[in-house]
A protein has these predicted regions:
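Acidic, His- and aromatic-enriched active-site or binding-groove loops in soluble protein domains
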Residues: 6-13
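Short, small-residue-biased leader/transition segments that mark boundaries at the very start
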Residues: 1-5
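Alpha-helical scaffold elements adjacent to nucleotide-binding pockets in ATP/GTP-utilizing enzyme cores
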Residues: 15-19
Length: 262
């Protein structure tokens, strides 16, 4: 039996909230059209109350000082890394490729060969902190907290988060339309990419299911950067299916981070 899989991530909506903080606008005023691949999607349109925010965002990118000032307004990563957070990587990518990217500067720096060539560069671009490792190592503490909540007679706090899944499920069950950026197979949705890759595109969910949006061609620069990672994805998928190590060797050689380190 063939399975229909739709994968969700929080980077698109999470970054949109960060951009609202950088731009000094309300998060609920933001609208965007973000497409690409998971952890490397591009905000092709970025608006607040219908006004294009890219001129203001590109103004921030003009100097390290303005980038640092904007980064200081961000709330999520500051809870993990404090004042060391700086979004210079993504502003630099936008400077050359024209669009802001959906993934954090820490992780985005691992998808390209530009920022991790030397320890000095890693420090310069503020991507030395491995906060996600610390987050993973705290799972035992989190598990104990969950046990206490389950064993307690008090109500468990369940504030609405930013993850797409609950709203997508609600849309399918009730028919109330909801739009989410989801990861789906590229059935001709992005014509710049191979048909056998996974893409991240806006999708509409309702009682009839999940409906990915047709995108067409991406701008050549952002598409080219996506393809450097799509090549790795496809080879690793082949390695998993065929159990052939050759595909793993080829994927490692093509990985942009290999170019940064070798």
């Amino acid at each position: 039996r063939q399975m229909c899989i739709r994968d969700s991530c929080h980077s698109v909506q999470g970054t949109a909230k960060m951009l609202a903080e950088y731009l000094d606008v309300k998060p609920e005023s933001m609208s965007y059209w973000c497409v690409g691949i998971n952890h490397m999607a591009w905000y092709l349109q970025l608006k607040s109350d219908g006004v294009d925010m890219y001129p203001k965002l590109k103004k921030i990118a003009e100097s390290k000082k303005t980038i640092a000032e904007a980064s200081a307004k961000e709330g999520h990563y500051h809870r993990h890394v404090g004042d060391k957070f700086n979004d210079g990587v993504r502003f630099e990518i936008m400077k050359y490729f024209g669009y802001f990217n959906s993934e954090s500067p820490f992780h985005m720096s691992e998808y390209v060969p530009y920022f991790r060539k030397t320890p000095e560069m890693i420090d310069e671009w503020h991507v030395s902190i491995r906060w996600w490792l610390e987050h993973e190592l705290s799972n035992d503490e989190y598990y104990e907290e969950l046990k206490k909540q389950v064993e307690s007679e008090e109500d468990i706090p369940m504030p609405q988060g930013e993850e797409y899944a609950p709203n997508v499920i609600h849309a399918v069950l009730t028919g109330k339309l909801f739009r989410a950026n989801l990861n789906v197979m590229n059935t001709g949705l992005i014509t710049s990419f191979p048909h056998d890759c996974c893409v991240e595109v806006p999708c509409f969910a309702d009682s009839e299911g999940i409906h990915p949006c047709y995108i067409g061609e991406l701008p050549e620069g952002p598409a080219g950067l996506n393809l450097t990672n799509i090549n790795v994805h496809r080879l690793m998928a082949k390695a998993a299916v065929t159990k052939k190590y050759q595909y793993i060797y080829e994927a490692i050689q093509l990985d942009p981070l290999t170019a940064a380190m070798c």
